[in-house]
Structure formats: C-alpha cells, structure tokens
C-alpha cells in the first residue's frame, strides 16, 4: 500500500460515550475513516501511525441524518466508522496531547 494513502485513510477519532466504553471494556479504538477504505488499509494505517498491533477491524457505514434548515430539508453526508481491536498490551490514548 502507498504510504501517502495510509496517512489519508484515518480522518480522526470518534469521541463518544460508546467509544469510551469500547476502549475500556474491549480494548478498541474508534475512528472516522474515508468511505472507500478497506479493512486492510485501516489496519495498516493504525499500526503505522500509532505503533500498535491490531487484532481486527470492523467497519460500518453511518447514514447521514436528515436535518431541517430555514430553506427546507437538508441531509448530512454519509460516513464510515471503524472499530479497531488492539492486541493485548497495546493502547492508544487520545486524551493526552502527546
């Protein structure tokens, strides 16, 4: 895989209550990824950027919500979410700025 592509696969972490519980209970990290990313690309990107070993990746497509604006109904974009299961002893800490 192209190194440049690996840097563009991950768009950012998903910070939510459900993601925090997944990190504590199942040693998982949750990321927002580009919509055409594959599981193998996501795994390679996380291993390269965070220097951790990844056991598995599960992905899901999140449908954009329909929102009402002053000009009528609008729709937010669809996006892809990835649950990355880390190996025992590996962890990613998003809260510290290091």
Swiss-Prot record:
Gene Ontology annotations for the cellular component aspect, listed alphabetically: ribonucleoprotein complex; ribosome
Disulphide bridges: none
Alphabetic keyword roster: Ribonucleoprotein, Ribosomal protein, RNA-binding, rRNA-binding
SUPFAM superfamilies: Ribosomal proteins S24e, L23 and L15e
Molecular function terms, GO-annotated: rRNA binding; structural constituent of ribosome
NCBIfam families named in the record: PRK05738.1-1, PRK05738.1-3, PRK05738.2-4, PRK05738.3-2
Name of this protein: Large ribosomal subunit protein uL23
Protein source organism: Teredinibacter turnerae (strain ATCC 39867 / T7901)
Encoding gene, per UniProt annotation: rplW
